[in-house]
Amino acid sequence: FGTYGHPRPRFYYNP
């Protein structure tokens, strides 16, 4: 999970 069209929280695009 990560930032899918949302403001990036703690992660970016991690599994």
From Swiss-Prot:
The cellular location(s) given in this protein's UniProt record come to: Secreted
Cellular component, GO annotation: extracellular region
This chain's function reads: Does not inhibit chymotrypsin or trypsin.
Keyword check for Secreted, yes or no. yes
User: Where is this chain primarily localised?
Assistant: secreted
Judging by the UniProt lineage, the source's domain of life is: Eukaryota
Answer whether the UniProt record assigns the keyword Repressor to this protein: no
Record-given protein name: BPTI-like protein
Which keywords accompany this UniProt record? Secreted
Tissue specificity, in the record's words, reads: Expressed by the venom gland.
State the species of origin. Answer: Daboia siamensis (Eastern Russel's viper)
